[in-house]
Amino acid sequence: MKFPAVKVLIISLLITSSLFILSTADSSPCGGKCNVRCSKAGRQDRCLKYCNICCEKCNYCVPSGTYGNKDECPCYRDMKNSKGTSKCP
């Protein structure tokens, strides 16, 4: 008897989280690209922050996919933080 209630709860949580991600989508040219890029990130807030910074500085270029492919955008690939590691997710 409890299993259908658990299934309904899980499905409603999945739908709610999907709607939340869509509602927080940025309307700038970088918003959609960074939402895709950061869709599998563990820390989406941090990923979106740095992706948007890099995207704007690199003339709205964001590599395709959720990881890698940085050769598509050399500016995005070459941007470093103060520690010398890649700034852009």
Curated annotation (Swiss-Prot):
Keywords: Disulfide bond, Gibberellin signaling pathway, Secreted, Signal
Pfam families, A to Z: GASA
Compartment(s) where it occurs, according to its Swiss-Prot or TrEMBL record: Secreted
Modifications after synthesis and translation: Six disulfide bonds may be present.
Record's GO cellular component terms: cytoplasm; extracellular region; plant-type cell wall
This protein's record includes keyword Disulfide bond: yes
InterPro entries per UniProt: GASA
Signal peptide: 1-25
Protein function: Gibberellin-regulated protein that may function in hormonal controlled steps of development such as seed germination, flowering and seed maturation.
Protein name, per record: Gibberellin-regulated protein 10
